[in-house]
From Swiss-Prot:
Pfam families: V-set. This is T-cell receptor beta chain V region E1. GO terms for biological process: adaptive immune response. Residues 121-136 are annotated as: J segment. Residues 117-120 are annotated as: D segment. It comes from the Eukaryota. GO terms for cellular component: T cell receptor complex. InterPro entries: Ig-like_dom (IPR007110), Ig-like_dom_sf (IPR036179), Ig-like_fold (IPR013783), Ig_sub (IPR003599), Ig_V-set (IPR013106), TCR_variable_domain (IPR051006). Residues 1-20 form the signal peptide. This sequence was derived from a T-helper clone. SUPFAM superfamilies: Immunoglobulin. Disulfide bonds join 44-112. PROSITE patterns: IG_LIKE. It comes from Mus musculus.
Amino acid sequence: MWQFCILCLCVLMASVATDPTVTLLEQNPRWRLVPRGQAVNLRCILKNSQYPWMSWYQQDLQKQLQWLFTLRSPRDKEVKSLPGADYLATRVTDTELRLQVANMSQGRTLYCTCSATGGLNTGQLYFGEGSKLTVL
Protein backbone atom coordinates (compact mmCIF):
# COMPACT_ATOMS: atom_id res chain seq x y z
CA MET A 1 0.00 0.00 0.00
CA TRP A 2 2.78 2.43 0.84
CA GLN A 3 4.34 1.83 -2.60
CA PHE A 4 1.07 2.97 -4.17
CA CYS A 5 1.09 6.15 -2.05
CA ILE A 6 4.68 6.91 -3.08
CA LEU A 7 3.78 6.32 -6.73
CA CYS A 8 0.79 8.70 -6.45
CA LEU A 9 2.98 11.33 -4.79
CA CYS A 10 5.61 11.04 -7.54
CA VAL A 11 2.98 11.39 -10.28
CA LEU A 12 1.48 14.42 -8.53
CA MET A 13 4.88 16.08 -8.14
CA ALA A 14 5.74 15.43 -11.81
CA SER A 15 2.46 16.94 -13.00
CA VAL A 16 3.00 20.07 -10.91
CA ALA A 17 6.63 20.43 -11.98
CA THR A 18 5.77 20.13 -15.70
CA ASP A 19 2.63 22.27 -15.62
CA PRO A 20 3.20 24.84 -18.42
CA THR A 21 0.87 27.40 -16.83
CA VAL A 22 3.36 27.92 -14.00
CA THR A 23 5.78 29.85 -16.22
CA LEU A 24 3.84 30.96 -19.31
CA LEU A 25 2.77 34.44 -18.15
CA GLU A 26 3.90 37.07 -15.69
CA GLN A 27 1.20 39.64 -14.95
CA ASN A 28 1.49 42.81 -12.84
CA PRO A 29 0.41 44.54 -10.77
CA ARG A 30 -1.42 41.79 -8.87
CA TRP A 31 -3.70 44.36 -7.22
CA ARG A 32 -4.12 48.10 -7.21
CA LEU A 33 -6.28 50.70 -5.46
CA VAL A 34 -7.42 53.14 -8.15
CA PRO A 35 -8.88 56.56 -7.30
CA ARG A 36 -12.07 57.20 -9.28
CA GLY A 37 -11.20 58.83 -12.62
CA GLN A 38 -7.53 57.81 -12.57
CA ALA A 39 -6.07 55.42 -15.17
CA VAL A 40 -3.99 52.35 -14.37
CA ASN A 41 -1.57 50.41 -16.58
CA LEU A 42 -1.28 46.62 -16.52
CA ARG A 43 1.53 44.58 -18.00
CA CYS A 44 1.74 40.96 -19.13
CA ILE A 45 4.98 39.22 -20.13
CA LEU A 46 4.93 36.03 -22.22
CA LYS A 47 7.49 33.45 -21.07
CA ASN A 48 7.00 30.86 -23.85
CA SER A 49 6.95 31.84 -27.53
CA GLN A 50 4.98 28.71 -28.48
CA TYR A 51 1.84 30.58 -27.31
CA PRO A 52 2.11 33.91 -29.22
CA TRP A 53 -1.55 34.96 -29.12
CA MET A 54 -2.14 37.17 -26.08
CA SER A 55 -5.52 38.38 -24.80
CA TRP A 56 -7.13 40.36 -22.00
CA TYR A 57 -10.29 39.31 -20.18
CA GLN A 58 -12.17 41.15 -17.44
CA GLN A 59 -14.14 39.67 -14.57
CA ASP A 60 -16.63 41.98 -12.91
CA LEU A 61 -17.80 41.97 -9.30
CA GLN A 62 -20.52 39.43 -10.19
CA LYS A 63 -17.74 37.06 -11.41
CA GLN A 64 -18.79 37.33 -15.08
CA LEU A 65 -15.80 36.77 -17.38
CA GLN A 66 -15.72 38.82 -20.60
CA TRP A 67 -13.21 38.80 -23.47
CA LEU A 68 -11.74 42.22 -24.26
CA PHE A 69 -8.91 41.90 -26.82
CA THR A 70 -6.63 39.45 -28.60
CA LEU A 71 -3.43 40.84 -30.13
CA ARG A 72 -0.71 38.92 -31.98
CA SER A 73 1.81 41.32 -33.52
CA PRO A 74 4.02 44.04 -32.03
CA ARG A 75 2.53 47.54 -32.33
CA ASP A 76 -1.04 46.18 -32.61
CA LYS A 77 -3.48 48.39 -30.66
CA GLU A 78 -7.17 48.24 -29.88
CA VAL A 79 -9.54 50.51 -27.96
CA LYS A 80 -12.81 49.55 -26.31
CA SER A 81 -15.30 51.41 -24.13
CA LEU A 82 -17.62 49.35 -21.96
CA PRO A 83 -19.95 50.33 -19.14
CA GLY A 84 -17.71 51.00 -16.17
CA ALA A 85 -14.33 51.38 -17.93
CA ASP A 86 -12.40 52.37 -21.06
CA TYR A 87 -9.60 50.13 -22.34
CA LEU A 88 -6.53 50.56 -24.54
CA ALA A 89 -4.59 47.36 -25.31
CA THR A 90 -1.13 47.49 -26.90
CA ARG A 91 1.08 44.63 -28.03
CA VAL A 92 4.42 46.25 -27.24
CA THR A 93 6.72 43.42 -28.35
CA ASP A 94 6.47 39.72 -29.19
CA THR A 95 6.49 39.04 -25.45
CA GLU A 96 4.76 42.06 -23.86
CA LEU A 97 1.09 43.04 -23.78
CA ARG A 98 -0.14 46.15 -21.94
CA LEU A 99 -3.57 47.34 -20.94
CA GLN A 100 -4.55 50.84 -19.84
CA VAL A 101 -7.81 50.97 -17.89
CA ALA A 102 -9.42 54.40 -17.45
CA ASN A 103 -12.68 55.89 -16.14
CA MET A 104 -13.46 52.91 -13.90
CA SER A 105 -16.66 53.20 -11.92
CA GLN A 106 -16.43 49.82 -10.16
CA GLY A 107 -13.76 47.26 -9.35
CA ARG A 108 -12.83 44.35 -11.56
CA THR A 109 -10.16 41.72 -12.08
CA LEU A 110 -8.30 41.57 -15.38
CA TYR A 111 -6.62 38.45 -16.72
CA CYS A 112 -3.98 38.11 -19.40
CA THR A 113 -4.09 34.88 -21.41
CA CYS A 114 -1.97 33.25 -24.06
CA SER A 115 -2.70 30.54 -26.62
CA ALA A 116 -1.01 28.78 -29.52
CA THR A 117 -3.62 29.93 -32.06
CA GLY A 118 -5.98 32.86 -32.47
CA GLY A 119 -9.45 33.42 -33.86
CA LEU A 120 -12.55 31.52 -32.81
CA ASN A 121 -10.65 28.27 -32.22
CA THR A 122 -7.98 29.34 -29.72
CA GLY A 123 -7.46 25.87 -28.34
CA GLN A 124 -6.12 25.82 -24.79
CA LEU A 125 -6.05 29.20 -23.03
CA TYR A 126 -3.48 29.77 -20.30
CA PHE A 127 -4.43 32.45 -17.75
CA GLY A 128 -2.18 34.79 -15.82
CA GLU A 129 -2.65 35.30 -12.09
CA GLY A 130 -4.95 38.29 -12.55
CA SER A 131 -4.85 41.97 -11.60
CA LYS A 132 -7.51 42.96 -9.08
CA LEU A 133 -8.46 46.64 -9.36
CA THR A 134 -10.46 48.32 -6.59
CA VAL A 135 -12.00 51.76 -7.13
CA LEU A 136 -11.69 54.23 -4.25
